Amino acid sequence: MNEDIKSFTISIYTENNIGLLNRISAIFQRRHINIESLTTSQSEIDGVNRFVIVVNMTETNANKIVKQIEKQVETIRAYYHTDEETIYQESCMFKIKSTLLFEEPQIQNIIKECNARIVTVNKEFFVLEKSGRRNEIESLRRDLNVFGIMQFVRSGRIAVTKDEMKVTEMLLAFNNQ
Amino acid sequence: MKTQTINKKQVAEKTQRITGSEAIVKSLMAEGVDILYGYPGGAIMPVYDELYKFQDQIHHVLTRHEQGAAHAAQGYARISGKVGVAIATSGPGATNLITGIADAQIDSTPIVCITGQVPSHLLGSDAFQETDIVGISTPVTKWNCQVTKSEDIPKAIAKAFYIAKSGRPGPVLVDITKDAQFGELDFKYEKCKGIRSYIPIPKTDPQSIIAAAELINNAKKPMIVWGQGVILGQAEEELKAVIEKAGIPAAWTILGASALPTSHPLNIGMVGMHGNYAPNKLTNECDVLIAIGMRFDDRVTGDLKTYAKQAKIIHFDIDPAEIDKNVKSDVAVLGNSKESLALLFDALNKNSHDSWLKEFKDLYAIEFEKVIKGDINPTKEGLTMGEVLKQINIESKGNAAIVSDVGQHQMIACRYADFNVSKSNITSGGLGTMGFALPAAIGAKMAAPDREVVAIIGDGGYQMNIQELGTIFQQKAAVKIVVLNNEFLGMVRQWQQLFFDKRYASTEMTNPNFVAIAEGYYIKAKKVTKREELAEAVKEMMASKESFFLEVCVEKEDNVFPMIPSGASVSDVRLS
């Protein structure tokens, strides 16, 4: 009966409400579920926000939690998906000493090979940006770590699902009531 | 320019320029509120000033503690089905409401709490009596919000009432800054009719009704367990019709009590930790278990791994998050119980299950012999809680509303009180809040002044909100108060006896003179210590037109049985 713990991406469409993040995070906290990453942004629908939350848990719990999230008054819809059911990316930035760019020719090769982008360069430092899967970002970080990284930051996961989200239909149905 | 002038004129006709605080009171009145419970203080004073002006239209009940206000609002809501309202100031006033709000959340009680808040320019500055009440109340409210602009007040209150009452009801808190109360707005009140992100009642899938009916029609040993969802959905008649048509024995959770009269031949009693022997035991014998408006609380199910594993489970609920939360269902029927039970009724065959029903009767006979007889007709010297309930039944004829607190007396009250009328068992079920009963009884009595309201309380819980005797006295609320005094925190003591080798850690109480305290509040009071005094005293209390306090000194170390020890299976219910 012991169910596997898997990584799930939880997508939540919500009204833009100041206290909702608290309500949603409390639902995870109650069950001692650690949030691996959380991003919130505008969704494809004007005025509707979208949370993308990555958690590791059993599917049974994912199902229960999604229903408890959906129950919140300002949640429009909530879904959970496995990694295979989503297209996902993370993004990261590195701040590195500018001198290294000229002194260590290998760095230029690393940047080219991994499709990273130089955002800015000045006398002291340059900033590198890369989007991709976690393992790609991690491998880049390992490669650059040899030369020294001044700052590193990685975003939470953003994801779109392969299947359709019927949020617009739901909102239209409400308007037509 | 011309059109603008016309528009302005139209607006002027429809709206009034008033202060935020007046708008709060007018919004409450527009929602039909004629009574509210609360306690004044700095950040809510502008609203109290308006309540003073409108006192002939809206009655403010000054409780003696904000917790009392929240529980009184709950009692009001539970007996009437209407939204109860509590009001408090910022800081401690607001935090004192929290226990009542949490209680209302877990027991799905519609209440709206209005709290004052420090002026918006002081928010976040640790101002005097500032607490982040929206943050604090978030996990225990169905919805909450903070209003910092006067013009947002009517909409926030309209939304609060709509959310509290619709779908699965619950508590809502609206926190309003003092500057929003002082500011002015063009007042126009429109009731909230819907929120696009919120579906209060999910649609009932006709297929689910067909599937449920098929299981029930083919069942040999069907059993119903209903909960408060039947009462909240006003589906008492529909439940009765379903039970009678299909001849199904039906048991109730503590909050479902009174939806079907106690005397109904298919009413087989209470399930759960101290429920009746037969429905607990036969939960693990039935072939179809039909759960209606209940949430498979751990106090109902005991060990989930051994709960009704042999049965097909049908779960009726308004809240999709309850489906498969604790017990996996074979058929889930979403929707309002009133409508879904009516649909089920049409799809059911007329049936009877006499030999199955006899199994319940046989087990009841065992429970009667081993437990009930000794509880209600004791032969030992000390008084029992059960015989007090029996006397109350004799006098009330099953027509009183029973408001119980939490503990042994609560289990006895729910097991033995007779109910003819729905919404008559008012108790703190999910949260188990000691101190609930006295203020809740005030709210219940004020909502239903024509009904007899009897608060049954232990000596422990009574002292948790004993200050509300002041409210009873001031309001002349004719609440009947029965304290079953065993000089112990009885339920904890029972557990200490059974599971902690009788180490009675901090459960013995040295009690004050309760009669003198009641009399100090000018409430008629009596104390009973002997069996021969009991009947007369209960009679006098029930006949009293005013509030009455009755202390009954009961056996100190009685236990409540049957009992399913924590974590045990329902079929391991103990009779001693």
Give the predicted meaning of each segment:
Chain B
Residues 173, 315, 403, 456-457:
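Generic enzyme active-site microenvironment
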Residues 114, 122, 128-129, 324-326, ...:
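Thiamine diphosphate
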Residues 2-15, 151, 189, 310-406, ...:
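Phosphate/pyrophosphate-binding active-site segments
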Residues 21-25, 29-34, 42, 47-52, ...:
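Active-site diphosphate/adenylate-binding microenvironment
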Residues 39-41, 60-71, 86-93, 148-149, ...:
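Active-site nucleophile and cofactor-binding loops and adjacent substrate-binding regions
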Residues 2-348, 352, 391, 395-398, ...:
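N-terminal alpha/beta PP-like core and its mobile active-site loop of ThDP/TPP-dependent enzymes
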Residues 227-231, 377, 458:
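Conserved short loop/turn motifs at secondary-structure junctions
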Residues 175-180, 407-409, 555:
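A glycine-rich phosphate-binding loop feature that marks nucleotide/adenosyl-phosphate handling sites
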